């Protein structure tokens, strides 16, 4: 395997949408308005400083993850998805790490994640990289029931 991590390229835009749509729908049954808005406004997100990373092997996308600025020096790590049809050991962790580094390199002092407590593999990645669970009064997504942050960047 000759996997490499690359920043957004137009030819992988649909993979970003498809991997995340597949993952969200297979786990929760439907996309939310916030998901659709993110997919429709990729260019606007990137103009605001966001970046989408891909793990790629021989021009095939394996996994993807987005890092986007929120308020002040807080950035969200989101839309971690993968290609179910291709074996990809470590691809999710690799794009997650690249997204964290992008945010840090662009002024993040705090990283933030909204997730769901049933997603054990994703929760493992967050904990592996030092994220700590936090309590929120409300969540941006109906499916969101757990949140994490990391401040020791």
Residue ranges and their predicted role:
Residues 7-85, 96-98, 102, 135-140, ...:
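Acetyl-CoA-dependent GNAT
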């Amino acid at each position: 395997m000759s996997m490499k991590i690359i920043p957004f390229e137009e030819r992988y835009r649909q993979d970003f949408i498809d991997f995340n749509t597949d993952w969200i729908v297979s786990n929760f049954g439907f996309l939310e308005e916030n998901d659709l808005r993110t997919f429709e406004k990729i260019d606007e997100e990137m103009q605001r400083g966001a970046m989408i990373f891909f793990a790629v092997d021989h021009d095939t996308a394996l996994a993807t993850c987005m890092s986007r600025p929120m308020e002040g020096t807080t950035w969200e790590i989101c839309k971690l998805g993968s290609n179910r049809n291709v074996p990809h050991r470590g691809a999710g962790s690799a794009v997650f790490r690249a997204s964290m580094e992008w945010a840090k390199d662009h002024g993040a002092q705090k990283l933030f994640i909204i997730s769901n407590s049933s997603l054990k593999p994703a929760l493992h990645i967050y904990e592996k990289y030092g994220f700590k669970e936090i309590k929120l009064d409300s969540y941006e997504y109906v499916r969101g029931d757990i949140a994490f942050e990391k401040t020791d960047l």
